[in-house]
């Protein structure tokens, strides 16, 4: 049997693409080979694809010398499959190319299954890798899981200001300015008052310039182009900048950290990145907490604009009423489409792991006939591939925050914000999506 798995192309939701890669990595890591029959090939962007083709020709020639006939044949088959996949591409795709081919052992340790797939990652992998062994190599894929939220940094002191961004492990200096502010005047008399006034005026103008450049660097199309903003410095400038009305009001809500650093310029940037690490990590969790808290608030207010539980959520989605789906990233519900072999009618079931082992869900209750399973998908995967067909968005929820944990345990890990009110009792009717013995206390788990 040949299995073809393809990661999604670049979508409008990076978190969905990251979720797909995370699931793919888990699948690959669970694959075990019989000997050295599993090939992993990753080609970075702009790499000459013919170079990899020549490498495979050499590896294929070397495989002919393997003494064990069974091992030799397995390795040759895996490398040949990789070559065939490579032939599908005239040049390396924009984000690089990943190919995994080989024969794996099933859970019984005896049955073999052929794995054979290729895909372009949703963002570049800048690392070449070729490996032929008893398992698939996934380390380069993990770089795709680094959260690519972009954060802005302003390092400001009495000598100048630096504007930069940090995205994953990549930082970029956007702009630097220098300034020469007059020192404090130590002499008394009228001249000291005049110098103090001039000094304060230059300081004010300097802060105005810093604030203006903050807007030009971190606002695009009338909205912030970074997820969060860090202000850093070794004097009072950073605090004044956060408190002044000269800073664009659109930037104020995204200030996530204000830190003291010992240096200005790039050394100050390095220090600010280190000191603000916890704050940057918390941004994602804060966003999740806010989203789920809003969900709970809507429930407590009984607005009728919330749906939860697998059956209600999926029916509302089918009606086009769901605007945003909240989905636990490790949801263990499988979507089945079953067909009556005599009548020809179909039904859709959403079953948890316990229900999947119960044969009653796969029988026609009137006749006792076994139903034909014509589709079987993890519900989370199905949603990730089909949510756009219903005009919805997907937001993944973890169980790492208190709110996320409550959403998973108390509401089944799936729910949504509605576009309009839906009478779920009328909408559901007698649909048996969970079987006639649907139990909300177990079917939501």
From Swiss-Prot:
The organism's superkingdom is given as Eukaryota
Q: Where is the signal peptide?
A: none
**Can you tell me where the transmembrane regions are?**
none
Q: Where in the cell is it found?
A: Cytoplasm
Could you tell me the keywords of this UniProt record? Answer: Cytoplasm, Protein biosynthesis
- Determine if Transferase is one of this entry's keywords: no
Single GO cellular component annotation?
cytoplasm
InterPro entries linked to this entry: eFR1_2_sf, eRF1_1_Pelota, eRF1_1_sf, eRF1_2, eRF1_3, Peptide_chain-rel_eRF1/aRF1, Ribosomal_eL30-like_sf
Q: How does it assemble?
A: Heterodimer of two subunits, one of which binds GTP.
**Functional summary from the UniProt entry:** Directs the termination of nascent peptide synthesis (translation) in response to the termination codon UGA. In Stylonchia UAA and UAG codes for glutamine.
Q: What is this protein called?
A: Eukaryotic peptide chain release factor subunit 1
State the organism named in the record: Stylonychia lemnae
